[in-house]
């Protein structure tokens, strides 16, 4: 059964304008039409109608760099938590994202792959949630930034194997840690993975048409990432 959403206005992001007296017509998971209510097509008499007389309807927002497993409230994210707590934290944060208008989340590093299960639960309609773009635990060197998340790999051969494993688990992209970060005993200005190690990851991922992004907060790591041919750099 279709549903009509009526609101004070609808945001037209293509033309950069606000359409007054707006509507959005939805059938299942598809937006069939939208615009000013004078353009509302004929619908069956039993069509559900939801009214938002003071609100403006906007397209779903995209959070392009999230960490749903990270606790909030001032708790340092590097304090090791169980996978069960990481998953429960992600469920809470996922709900907050959805209620704030975010309908797509690109998560840039979870703990031991718990978000793969969460995405499956959402896809099976067990839970309400956004669309997910996932990488699983980021790959990092022994003792490197975010090492506690479960993605430690050293040397080109081991890194390439880990890349293939991540993709088999369901990763949409590969994330590597190219410099230190907020983890104790790491330094944001210091490179972690070498250019050769990053290049091994890029080669393995690109062979399977999967993009690669790298956490870099210092120039040496950025240079390594660029020379290795990565697709994206986070934080630079």
Predicted regions and their residues:
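Alpha-helical scaffolding segments of alpha/beta enzyme cores, especially the outer helices
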Residues: 117-120, 158-161, 165, 196-203, ...
């Amino acid at each position: 059964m279709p549903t009509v959403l009526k609101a004070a206005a609808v945001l037209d992001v293509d033309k950069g304008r606000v359409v007054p007296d707006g509507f959005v017509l939805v059938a299942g998971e598809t937006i069939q039409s939208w615009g000013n209510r004078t353009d509302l097509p004929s619908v069956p008499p039993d069509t559900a109608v939801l009214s938002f007389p003071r609100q403006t309807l906007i397209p779903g927002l995209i959070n392009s760099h999230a960490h749903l497993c990270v606790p909030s409230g001032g708790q340092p994210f590097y304090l090791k938590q169980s996978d069960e707590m990481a998953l429960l934290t992600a469920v809470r944060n996922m709900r907050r994202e959805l209620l704030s208008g975010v309908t797509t989340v690109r998560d840039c590093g979870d703990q031991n792959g718990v978000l793969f299960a969460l995405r499956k639960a959402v896809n099976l309609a067990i839970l309400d949630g956004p669309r997910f773009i996932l990488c699983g635990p980021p790959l990092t060197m022994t003792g490197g930034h975010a090492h506690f998340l479960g993605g430690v790999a050293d040397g080109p051969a081991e890194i390439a194997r880990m890349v293939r494993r991540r993709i088999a688990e369901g990763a949409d992209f590969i994330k590597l840690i190219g410099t230190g970060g907020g983890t104790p005993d790491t330094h944001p200005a210091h490179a972690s993975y070498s250019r050769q190690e990053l290049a091994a990851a890029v080669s393995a991922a690109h062979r399977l048409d999967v993009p690669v992004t790298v956490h870099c907060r210092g120039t040496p790591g950025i240079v390594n990432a660029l020379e290795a041919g990565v697709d994206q750099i986070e934080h630079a």
